[in-house]
Amino acid sequence: MAGLVAAWQLTQAGLKPVLVESRGYTGGLVAGSQLAGIAYDIGAEGWATRRPDTSQLATELGLVVEPPVRQPSWVWFDDGAFAMPSDAVLGIPSDVTSADVVTAIGGTAADLAAELDSRPVPDEVPESLGELVRTRLGEEVLTRLVGPIAGGIHAAVPDLLSADVVAPGLRAALVRTGSLQQAVAAQVRTRGDSPVVASVAGGMFRMPQTLHEQIEAAGGQILTRTGAKSISASPTGLEPGASPATAGVASDPVPDGHDAQGGRWLVTTAATSRNPNPSLPPIPDGDPVTYCTDRVIVACNAAPALDLLSDVIDVTGPALTAGAPIAHVNLALQAPELDGAPRGGGMLVAPGSTTVRAKALTHLSRKWPSLGASCPSHVHLSLIHI
């Protein structure tokens, strides 16, 4: 997506970029497919609305921004499923005495949370989300409310998450109000009825499709099954001491091992084929083609970006940490029992569950109105994260 957006922005400035993409489609983890004749998202299905950038981009592309159906989120524990409190930030409740919170954590834990949050705010407010919740509301609130939500969104335990990053302004509001519950309530009031996530009506996969179409309509080129192999400074085009350019992409190809007068960078590409393991990068198997250009944008995952840039800049730094593996299972169900959405738009599974192997379930056709409208009667699309 980053490469598509960059190329589209260049066309808005009157340039005609060349975008190379090693896979056979553009958009990366924003992609669509069909199941039972219904088009749906197989990757990312929406975005957080805390920042307006993605919603603004969708509008500029002529797409309709769609909020999800308002309904409670659910969490599964081995002792049962329960609805999460609606007036909350990352599962942190604005009122620990409310019925939904007491149902989730029990009366004793709710009383302890209220007592902890009544204590004076210390001079040193914990920086990690986990320690912040633990000290102000107790372990049960952290484990049963915050852990599943924060872990599901950020794929990390709360103790490893910076409160200022994942919940901006929350620590400052705690200092100002003297209560974590009141700090959450203030953020909930500010948020109002605005949804915390949104998508594109008809599927988020329409965003890369539209970007692709508009780039080509503006004169840009998109070369799929074409991977970048290397970037190097052009010996004739790059003046001593010149700084790397930060905008633009490749121009005309030149024979391998040659460069054109005036171009600062040589970008060598090659055709690719599908890897037998689709989760791994495609395999370069074509003859090299070198482009000479004044400006290059590198918009890809960290590991290949470091490889591409290693010949032109110092890329030494911390080792990259591999993400946790995850698989998606998509189901089209003929199930009248799901018409009432007994688990709303989906359910998270608490870490440590011994009865359910999945990490989460999303009832896609219930969550997104346009997708639900495209499903036949009693047919439901669900996504299981394993």
Residue ranges: model-predicted function:
Residues M1-A2:
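Hydrophobic/small residue at the entry helix of a nucleotide-binding pocket
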Residues T11-Q34:
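Glycine-rich FAD pyrophosphate-binding loop
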Residues A13, A218, V289:
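Conserved dinucleotide-binding and phosphotransfer motif residues
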Residues A36-V121:
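Dinucleotide-binding Rossmann-like beta1-alpha1 core, especially the glycine-rich loop
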Residues A113-G227, G237, P253, G257, ...:
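Active-site/ligand-binding neighborhood in enzyme catalytic cores
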Residues T226-V379:
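Mid-domain catalytic core of redox enzymes
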Residues I384-I386:
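Conserved small/polar residues in nucleotide/adenosyl-binding loops
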